[in-house]
Design a protein with these regions (language model features):
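N-terminal signal peptide c-region/cleavage motif recognized by signal peptidases
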Residues: 4, 11-13
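Generic N-terminal initiation segments characterized by hydrophobic and/or small/turn-forming residues
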Residues: 5-7, 22-23, 96
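Short N-proximal segments of mature Sec-exported proteins
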Residues: 19-81, 101
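Short, compact, well-ordered microdomains
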Residues: 81-110
Length: 110
C-alpha cells in the first residue's frame, strides 16, 4: 500500500477508508474557514510519529531535516505547492503524502 503503511505498519482496507485524504488536508492547509492550525497539528503529528517509529534495523530513517530547519509555515506552504503539482495523490491518505513530500524535501545522506 502507501508509504505510510510501510512506515507505520497500518493495515489496508477499512482503516484506510477512514483516513483524511490529501485533498481534504489541503483545504485546511490553505486556511479555508480558519483551519490552518488543523493542518499544522496534523502535519506535526505525522512527523512526530515518524520520529518515534524509527528503528535502524526495521524502519531506517528516510527524512533528515538539517538545522537550521525552515519554519513550519514554510514547510506547509511548500507541501501545498507539492500536493497541487502531484494531483495523482489527491485521494491518497494525507499522512502518506506528507511523508512522501518530507522524504523528497529532506532526504537523508545528501
Amino acid at each position: 500500500m502507501a508509504l505510510t503503511s510501510a512506515v507505520l505498519g497500518f493495515s489496508t482496507g477499512a482503516q484506510a477508508a477512514n483516513m483524511i485524504s490529501t485533498q481534504e488536508l489541503l483545504q485546511d492547509c490553505k486556511g479555508a474557514n480558519g483551519t490552518f492550525i488543523t493542518c499544522e497539528i496534523y502535519g506535526q503529528a505525522v512527523y512526530d510519529t515518524y520520529l518515534v517509529t524509527r528503528n535502524p534495523k526495521s524502519a531506517p530513517e528516510f527524512i533528515c531535516v538539517k538545522q537550521p530547519a525552515p519554519t513550519r509555515k514554510e514547510v506547509i506552504q511548500e507541501y501545498v505547492k507539492w500536493a497541487e503539482a502531484n494531483t495523482k495523490y489527491a485521494t491518497e491518505p494525507a499522512a502518506d503524502t506528507i511523508l512522501r513530500f518530507l522524504a523528497g524535501k529532506f532526504p537523508c545522506g545528501k
